[in-house]
Each structure stands twice: as C-alpha cells, then as structure tokens.
Amino acid sequence: MARYRLIIKPTSSFQTPLHSDTLFGHICWALRYLKGEDELLKFLKLFNDDNSPLILSDGFPKDYLPMPVLRPLSLDEEKELQQKYRTKLEFAREMKMLKKVSYIQVSAMEMLKNELSYYNLYTKHLLGEILLENPNISKTDEVWHNAKNRLTDRVIEGKLFAKEDTFYGKGAELNVYVEDAYFNRKSFCEIFDFISKSGYGADKSVGRGAFEYDLLDGWDFPEAENPNAFMTLSHYHPKEGDFKEGFYDTATKFGKIGGHWASGVDGGPYKMPLLMLNPGSLFFPDTHKTFYGSLIPNVHKQQGVVHYGIALPLKVRIV
C-alpha cells in the first residue's frame, strides 16, 4: 500500500472537525462526481473484513498524535509523583492540567513506545524530558447568526442562534496519515483538488472548510519493537474479534449524508447514531493487523449507505 501524509492548511474557519469518517464521506462524494456512481460502488465493494483499500487517520496538528488513553494511575504511583511537588495543591493543579491535554508530540511517543503508561508520561514531563501541552494553532469561538423565517424568507427580529467555528492561526497545518491501495497519486490529488475547492464540512457553501493541501509520500510512526497493544489514530467502530480489552474514550456520531442527497432524500439527511471510539484509545488484540474495524452498513433508510469505522493502528507496548 502507498503511504501518504496529507497536509491540510486551513484558509477559512471550520465548523466540522477533521475526522476520518467525515473525510471518507467527502472522498466518496468527490469520487462520485468526478468518476461516476459506478466507480464509487466499485470502490466500496472492495471493503470487507480482510481488506481495506483506503485507511485514514484523523487530522492532527503537525508533529503531534492523539494523547493515549491509558490505565489510571495507581495509588502508589500517585503518591510517588506527588512527592516531586512541594504541596498537594501544586500536584492537584498539575494533574488537572495534564488531564486536559489532547495531543502528544511524536518525539514523546518515540521515547515511550516500549513503556507506555501515565506514570512514565507524567514522570518524563516532570523531569523536563518531554512537554505535555496542547499545540496553540486554533481557537474556537461562537459565531452568532440571524434566524430566518423559511416561509417569508425574512429575518426573524430578535431571534439569534450561535454556531461554533474553529479559527486556525497563520501557518497552521493538520496532518492526515493515509494508506492507499486503490488510488494512484494523481487520482488522489484530483480527489483533494475537488474537496479543497468545494470545501469541507458544515456551511462549506458559505465559505467554511476551505483549505489548501500538500501530499507527501511516506511516513513512519514510532512503533514498539514488541507491541502488546495498538492505539487508534482514527474514529473507530470495532467489529467482533478486533480486541480482547482496552482503554478508550467514546463519542456518539450523528453522521450526515452529503452531496446532492443532503438537500433532501427519503429517510432524511442524518444517519442513525453510532458509538465511535476516539483517537488515542488503546486495545489489546490477539493479532496485530494493518487495520481494524469496517464499513458499517444499515445506517440509513437508503440502501447502500455506509459509515466509515476503520482504524489506522499505531503499535505500542503498555506497561
């Protein structure tokens, strides 16, 4: 499989996060409009329990990966860490701050790939060997809008509603890691030329979700030499037998149908709610594979509509 690093450079605010499942939906609609419905159906039919011709991660800030979800600190580990602080209050403040960190530097994962635990993470942070903090590349603000009467096409006086927009700083980059066995480099670029021009996510018709992109060949992750677990880099919906146990965070996804179906289709614009496992979640599999999860069928009244639940795994060793 070809490996690409897709570098997204936002040029407007985004209302929709750069999640693997949403990105896959945009790729499918781009393929439908550029190559036709038969080509899209041919692509989707290649997915099965043993084959995934396209594996996508979420979009992460440059040089960062998702913070792993690990076993909580034991009482003994907590006491040991607390001794490094002058007061219990200082320790409590630091722990509160660390629990809000959503990303970890790739260099920190390289150091800890063979001995990953919260205790080791926090110890190296306290010693100054790594720095655990969220990258400062974006800000999320409420943007207020006028409500509109759909019958009269006029603004309703005094009625406002807010939406959250994420604004990215100058030079901000989000990296999506791709494993591709279907498209060649030229056709993959055609897909993202289309998406970058039409926009990504909610309110793209009014300028949200605009971006430029680069596509670089190859990427290497810091993977454990003797792994006993994997960390998902994607929003992931597991299938039976993927793993025995794990540590994870969940999100309920209300997927929305895109393309010309978004303006009206039997069954409405929304898919059925799905429970997804967030990037950074860790699992102990019986065997290590190149991907986990599958396309999820029967998520809408329209036959053939699927949802992307495939995980790009990073092999690690949990201690």
Regions inferred by a protein language model and the residue ranges of each:
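Conserved active-site/ligand-binding neighborhood in enzyme cores
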Residues: 1-319
